[in-house]
Swiss-Prot record:
The keyword Ion transport applies. It comes from Homo sapiens (Human). This is P2X purinoceptor 5. Residues 1-30, 363-444 are cytoplasmic. GO terms for molecular function: ATP binding; ATP-gated ion channel activity; extracellularly ATP-gated monoatomic cation channel activity; identical protein binding; ligand-gated monoatomic anion channel activity; monoatomic ion channel activity; purinergic nucleotide receptor activity; transmembrane signaling receptor activity. Belongs to the P2X receptor family. Residues 378-444 are annotated as: Disordered.
Length: 444
C-alpha cells in the first residue's frame, strides 16, 4: 500500500486541473459584473496610470542646496541714531545667505549702554521691594536685567520701589514703535537660487535660467509666466502668503517659501519646472503676548578712555524659511507589472462579489447555488450509503407484501398451485396424501 500510494502521489504531480464554469443567465448580475469590470478598468487606467503614473519608478530622495540674497536700502532719521542708511549688512541676519534668513523691519534701539548700577524696571515682579532687606545682594533678578546690589530704590512718598541692580544701563525701554522702523523693506528683493539632484536617475537642475547675459537677473522679476527668474519682491511674498506687510513688519512673523519639483523624466528635461507656494508658518494671535517674532542683539564700541559700551537693539522682523521637496519618476517595467497585477486581482474580487449576490441575495439563489456547487463524497461513504439504500428497499418490499413474506412456510404456501390445495382438502379424513398408492395390487 505504501508503494502504491507513493506511486499515485508521484503520478498526480503531472495532473492538470482546470476550473468548471457555470454561465448564469441572469441579466441583473451580469450587468453588475460588467459595471464592476468597467469601474476597475477605469480606476486602473485613469487613476493608477494617468494621474498617479503607476508605470514609473519614483525617486523621492531629493538633494537640494539653497542660496539666498536680499537687496535694498532704507533711510531712517531718529533722535537716538540720527540720519542713517540701512543696507543688507545691517538688516539681514545671517549674512551668509542660507535657506533660513531674517529681515529686520522694526527696532527698539537703546544706545550708549554701559555696565553700571540703576533701578530695575517696574514691570519685573522679582525686582519689586519695600525695604533693603527685600533685595538680596548678589542675587539675579528673575526674568530681569541684572544682579541685585542690596538697595531698595523708592520714589518720594511711595511705599514700594524697585531693587537697584548692576546691569547694562540705561535699561531697555519696553515701548514699541507704532509704525515699522524700516518702511522701505516692503520693496526689498529676495533672490533664491536652488540646485536640486535626484540621485537614482542622476538628474540635476536649477531654478535659474541658464543664460550668459548677466543683465537678465538685474531686470527680471518672478511671475506666473517666469518661473526661472527667482527674484521676489518682499511685499509680494507677504501678500501671497495671505498677510499684510504693515502688520507683520510691526510685530514680526515667519513666512514659508516652498519650492516643489515634480519631474516626469519620460519627457524632456526642459519640462521639469519648479513650483512656488507661500504661507505664514506662525499663528497670528491678536490677543496673545507671544505673537510675532523678535530677538535682541548688540553692537559694541569703546570710548576714548577704552571703556566698553554698546548699542542694544531689539529687532522685530520677518523670518523666511525656504523649503524644497519633490520627486522624479521614470518608466520601469516592475511597477507596471505590479499595478497591472493588482488590477487583475481586483477583477477577481468583482467576480467574487457577484458570486455572493448570485447565491445569497437574489430570489433564485438556491437554484444557482445547487448548480454552482456539487457535493462529492468519498468511496467508503458511497458504499455504505448504497448498502443502506438496499436494506431500506428490502424492508419496504416486505412491508408492502404482507406477513406471508416474513417466513418461508408461508412463502411456499403462496407458491403452491391451486390443484394441490384441492387435493389436500379432500383427504383430510385419513391423513394420506395419495391413498391409491397405499392399496395392495390384486392379481386377476
Amino acid at each position: 500500500m505504501g508503494q502504491a500510494g507513493c506511486k499515485g502521489l508521484c503520478l498526480s504531480l503531472f495532473d492538470y486541473k482546470t476550473e468548471k464554469y457555470v454561465i448564469a443567465k441572469n441579466k441583473k448580475v451580469g450587468l453588475l459584473y460588467r459595471l464592476l469590470q468597467a469601474s476597475i478598468l477605469a480606476y486602473l487606467v485613469v487613476w493608477v496610470f494617468l494621474i498617479k503614473k503607476g508605470y514609473q519608478d519614483v525617486d523621492t530622495s531629493l538633494q537640494s542646496a539653497v542660496i539666498t540674497k536680499v537687496k535694498g536700502v532704507a533711510f531712517t532719521n531718529t533722535s537716538d541714531l540720527g540720519q542713517r542708511i540701512w543696507d543688507v549688512a545691517d538688516y539681514v541676519i545671517p549674512a551668509q545667505g542660507e535657506n533660513v534668513f531674517f529681515v529686520v523691519t522694526n527696532l527698539i534701539v537703546t544706545p550708549n549702554q554701559r555696565q553700571n548700577v540703576c533701578a530695575e524696571n517696574e514691570g519685573i515682579p522679582d525686582g519689586a521691594c519695600s525695604k533693603d532687606s527685600d533685595c538680596h545682594a548678589g542675587e539675579a533678578v528673575t526674568a530681569g536685567n541684572g544682579v541685585k546690589t542690596g538697595r531698595c530704590l523708592r520714589r518720594e512718598n511711595l511705599a514700594r520701589g524697585t531693587c537697584e541692580i548692576f546691569a547694562w544701563c540705561p535699561l531697555e525701554t519696553s515701548s514699541r514703535p507704532e509704525e515699522p522702523f524700516l518702511k522701505e523693506a516692503e520693496d526689498f528683493t529676495i533672490f533664491i537660487k536652488n540646485h536640486i539632484r535626484f540621485p537614482k536617475f542622476n538628474f540635476s537642475k536649477s531654478n535659474v535660467m541658464d543664460v550668459k547675459d548677466r543683465s537678465f537677473l538685474k531686470s527680471c522679476h518672478f511671475g506666473p509666466k517666469n518661473h526661472y527668474c527667482p527674484i521676489f519682491r518682499l511685499g509680494s511674498v507677504i501678500r501671497w502668503a495671505g498677510s499684510d506687510f504693515q502688520d507683520i513688519a510691526l510685530e514680526g512673523g515667519v513666512i514659508g517659501i516652498n519650492i516643489e519639483w515634480n519631474c516626469d523624466l519620460d519627457k524632456a528635461a526642459s519640462e521639469c519646472h519648479p513650483h512656488y507656494s507661500f504661507s505664514r508658518l506662525d499663528n497670528k494671535l491678536s490677543k496673545s503676548v507671544s505673537s510675532g517674532y523678535n530677538f535682541r542683539f548688540a553692537r559694541y564700541y569703546r570710548d576714548a578712555a577704552g571703556v566698553e559700551f554698546r548699542t542694544l537693539m531689539k529687532a522685530y522682523g520677518i523670518r523666511f524659511d525656504v523649503m524644497v521637496n519633490g520627486k522624479a519618476g521614470k518608466f520601469s517595467i516592475i511597477p507596471t507589472i505590479i499595478n497591472v497585477g493588482s488590477g487583475v486581482a481586483l477583477m477577481g474580487a468583482g467576480a467574487f462579489f457577484c458570486d455572493l449576490v448570485l447565491i445569497y441575495l437574489i430570489k433564485k439563489r438556491e437554484f444557482y447555488r445547487d448548480k454552482k456547487y456539487e457535493e462529492v463524497r468519498g468511496l467508503e461513504d458511497s458504499s455504505q450509503e448504497a448498502e443502506d439504500e438496499a436494506s431500506g428497499l428490502g424492508l419496504s418490499e416486505q412491508l408492502t407484501s404482507g406477513p406471508g413474506l416474513l417466513g418461508m412456510p408461508e412463502q411456499q404456501e403462496l407458491q403452491e398451485p391451486p390443484e394441490a390445495k384441492r387435493g389436500s382438502s379432500s383427504q383430510k379424513g385419513n391423513g394420506s396424501v395419495c391413498p391409491q398408492l397405499l392399496e395392495p395390487h390384486r392379481s386377476t
